[in-house]
Amino acid sequence: MIKVIEQGSYMNRVDKLPDGLYSAECSYLGTHYECSVVFYIDARRMETVRASYAVHRTPKNDNLIEDDIPELVGQTCTFAANKIIKGLPDYDGNGFIKELLLENLRGINQAEMYMLEEMGIDGPIEYEKKWLNEKVNYCRPYTGRMPGLYDRPHYVNSLNHFRKQNLYNKYKQYTIISSGGDVVTANTTYQDSFHEMHAQLSYSLTTREITDFDMTMQRWPFAACFEMDHMAAGLFIGKNIDDLTKREVGALIGGSEGCFHLVDIVADVAKAARDLKNAGR
């Protein structure tokens, strides 16, 4: 008999508002938690003008709250805000709000290519040129100076269809399934406006060792991204799933030579596996 023992999903979107403002929303819906965050940002200065969070459900239904995060007001909404977010309180008791705040930064970064007027950039190709050096430690294509780097605007069709209202959407989901034995299987999916991938891994409940791993990439902006499809399988088999923090997964895939979206989906499953173990479920 197959039994779902844990599942969760992350949803993120970025939308344009009047007067140079944008909203970035991210939520998590899981078996034991429901949380969300919202940023309102000024793209002319790339600053947060308001940030709020909500905790709607926890295992014991404690720490339920909706409130603002004044520490982020007036701060950058770029990746430079990572350090500020990491220093915030653990609002929900399990790190979900902090993770959603970081997800929002990633979503804003992906949506930047549609904020060009506010940022004073002439067009998508000029945007890629601007980021050529600044993203050198960002992900595989930029770090490796891959051929066809300026193909991204063509791939995402921003030259023919420049998004004006809804700029970016993302959905991540995982399900951990047991068939009654010692080995459980996790299926995880990542889909956003520019990428799509699926991974499946199995691990032992007693030894915590990952016994199988496979992934498929269905959509990607660059040929260099697709190489991860062939490289990833051997990276995780034999590893202890409890050790797979984002930092550890990032190191395994080669840091900025790898795909940080793969980091996301593997680390999400590893966190869920640790949570199950710690809760005795």
What residue spans do the PLM features occupy?
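Generic multipass alpha-helical transmembrane bundles of integral membrane proteins
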Residues: 145-150
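Short, Gly/Pro- and small/polar-rich lid/capping loops
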Residues: 1-27, 152-180
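Active-site- and interface-proximal helix/loop "cap" or "latch" segments in soluble metabolic
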Residues: 4-144, 190-281
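Short beta-strand or tight-loop elements
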Residues: 172, 182-184, 195-197
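Short, basic/aromatic recognition patches
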Residues: 185-189
